[in-house]
Amino acid sequence: MESAITGRSRSTVSQLSRIVSGGHTGVDRAALDAALAAGIEIGGWCPRDRRSEDGIIPARYPLRETASRSYAVRTEWNVRDSDATLILVLDRISSGTRLTVDSAKSQGQPLRIEYLCENSKPGLLTEELSLEHRVAEVGDWIRREQIQTLNVAGPRGSSRKDVYLKSLEFLSMLFAEISVVPGRRTVKKAKHKYTPRGQD
């Protein structure tokens, strides 16, 4: 269930300090790349041997390996070790992304699903929202929930060739938007030191 957006002032500075992702192609890597560019700490769990559909997850992403090669394990652990999960999809939720949705719900974690393609969000019968407006809404959600560690997930790169670029654009705008301090625009450097919430 998506969190509702309140009228919280965007002058409130977000405490977001860490982006977590599984390192897969597509949305996962867009999240890591956008965070790196914004000076936000990154991390998360990935399958054993840094497994990914394009081979091995590049070493520039400091992810920790689970004991399993299963994608499901790292999905559950990334949800567990985050304050909330943001899912980006183009026009539909795939079976792999559905696992993240189910994991967040079963763990009682805040969850938001953001549709990146126009006319794809269920129940959107009124005027289409601009990209800037949708980015601002997600930024308000992050502030209201006081999210420090955000898990970002979504479809892999092979699902559609534009999923990485669309996700990178959205997240780059988001990380810039939540770093706004009244009177100036700067990128907030991460100060949060990550400590896992336990290993199974």
Q: Which stretches of residues belong to each language-model region?
A:
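Basic/polar N-terminal segments that are highly enriched at the extreme N-terminus
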Residues: 1-15, 188-200
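Charged phosphate-binding loop/patch that engages nucleotide di/tri-phosphates or the phosphate backbone
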Residues: 159-162, 166-196, 200
